[in-house]
């Protein structure tokens, strides 16, 4: 029997590290030499990985990786629909870090906030989305999938050949997720494209509009979601912008949590939050508009009277709940039939699919990640039936929900279309998972040059001895000042954790508590006209009518504390699985950072 070889403590440590890396699904087991939490986060994703097709040599980051030892008991791969983005090179990340430390931030003019869709997507260029290639029933499943993979690689090759990596935005490189979109479009009678009102041009790919209304011959309804986060005049301006440029669109305004815009707002109280309980989902603004749009599209081919009756019941129930002071959400309403689509349901359908089959209209909900597709479905149903999360890519596969016996909703995973947007803007739009950003500082600088972050958060320059003196700010200074104010420290050296502070600032922006809204072209010159527009007044009255009136709890303030340590190095974006709770920005004069109860906010994401 051979002698046992000595096994040192160092070797044992390396063995355990490799084992943990394999469980996380990482390929090369890179470990950071830094002991700080921020350093380990930034270097943990440094492994090289390629997409499923070997013809595209660009490095791909596979986000939302789930630990898995292969297929599950039912043959389900939890990483099948994870986000695939092009990886930033190490040199590019370091260059942006240096710029964040050295570049002095200058406020931009209002005209810079105006976005033209022609500059973002360049209609008619290769910035398209992949189409399902022609197929026939004689083809086997393997032949069809192989053909789709070849077509997808050709699509990626054209884009990367026409534009450099520095010009291209993040966009989806996972073919499995695009297959979800193909299936949803094939089975839908009406397509809802959900966008965020703060930046609707970012979420509106013209190629999808041309494909749905042209090649498929379907009606496209543009939903401007989260209208409570933008001024009513800006909402109306965006609505007219899309009507003017895309006449076949049906535009609907929507929000799951409306507020009265006539309520005075304190822009400095970004850390104030209130909890809405009870019948929050039944207060959604927009179901009536969406019903009218669907009635105009179906022109009597589908009986939608049951949908109208449901809306009337929801409105009456919400009014009764406010009057009686009831706080608990009613759970004994009509059951909602949920269908999870299996692989067999993902098979392509024929080109001559019957429209409004069996008297049922199928409404497909598509859009970018984090625009509120799942929240919109919850608002239409009147209670929570879909899990929602701040983390992009939370919806893994499409599901169908029967709103009424004649109305079926289909929720599609969020997809990011190729464009020429700055990647910092995509991060602020919530498209990229914040906890997995390699370099968040330039996104903070992009935000601070467009809204006065230092003034809103009452930040003190880290090098300022006299608080009244003015000092030039860079993105790194803002992150360091926020880390000092919030008490974010690294684990061992107790230095200011600027990486964690940058993530916290980006979460405030994504949540709408640091609201950055973009404008349609010419809005600055015509702002007064839009503010006095009749539709603006109508929207203000409508939001005030359906806004919260008695279903809000006492406001909560966030604690200035360093006791809220993050658990490990994993994504801390928690799924919002509560049964009717929703954190929403609110305003209150005299907001402070120190809460009276030091344990009240131990579960907050920013801690």
From Swiss-Prot:
Protein name: Guanine nucleotide-binding protein-like 1
Residues that, per the record, bind GTP: 225-228, 367-374, 411-415
Bias-annotated ranges (Basic residues): 1-14
Record's compositionally biased regions (Acidic residues): 550-584
Protein family membership: Belongs to the TRAFAC class YlqF/YawG GTPase family.
InterPro entries reported in the protein's UniProt record: G_CP_dom (IPR030378), GNL1-like (IPR043358), GTP-bd (IPR006073), P-loop_NTPase (IPR027417)
Record has Magnesium as a keyword: no
UniProt gene name: GNL1
Region Disordered, annotated ranges: 1-81, 547-607
UniProt modified residues of type Phosphothreonine: 48, 50
Domains: entry comment: In contrast to other GTP-binding proteins, this family is characterized by a circular permutation of the GTPase motifs described by a G4-G1-G3 pattern.
Signal peptide annotation: none
GO terms for MF: GTP binding; GTPase activity
Domain CP-type G: 178-418
Pfam families: MMR_HSR1
CDD domains xrefs: HSR1_MMR1 (cd01857)
Organism from which the protein derives: Pongo abelii (Sumatran orangutan)
Basic and acidic residues composition-biased segments: 15-26
